[in-house]
Amino acid sequence: MRITYLLLSLVLCLCPVMQAQNTTNQFMKQAQSSLEKKDYTKARYLFLQAYKSLSQQGDYKQAIDAGTQAAYLYYCENYYQEAFDLCRQMNQFILTEELKLQKSLYEQRFQVTKERLEMYIKLKNAAQAQVQLNTLDNLASQAGDEKLSNNLLYTQAGYYYTFGQNEQGDAAFQKL
């Protein structure tokens, strides 16, 4: 009798967790599908819902992936304020997760900062873009991750070419 109650309790406890994960997966699948169909408003909404759900579950990697997708879709439609607000929310979420995990999440910080850099590049704000580029450089150095370093070099090259600094862009590509 006690075993039956124990099993029933266990199933009832796990059911909402599995349902939340399924809902999040549905958000991501539907968002990708909407993106492929070029329904950007719906895709943005679904990526935002996935970000919120994943951040509540503490899945920081997938949450930041979904959040940066939503931010990208915001600023592609010139909703810069919303995109910057979302980036601030993601930075706060990363900080909370770093405190909880007692480790630095360089890759996620890099991802959000790079998205912010792309916004400044699209706005043709070279000064703020340079600040973000310097932040990316610091994050890549602190992380000591070759993948981030290569991503940084590629990003630097794009930045330099965008703002007419072709020699520096060529130098960044040579380092790759």
Can you say where each PLM-predicted feature lies in the sequence?
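Bacterial N-terminal signal peptides
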Residues: 7-15
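A "functional boundary" signal
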Residues: 19-176
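Positively charged n-region of N-terminal signal peptides that target proteins for export
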Residues: 1-5
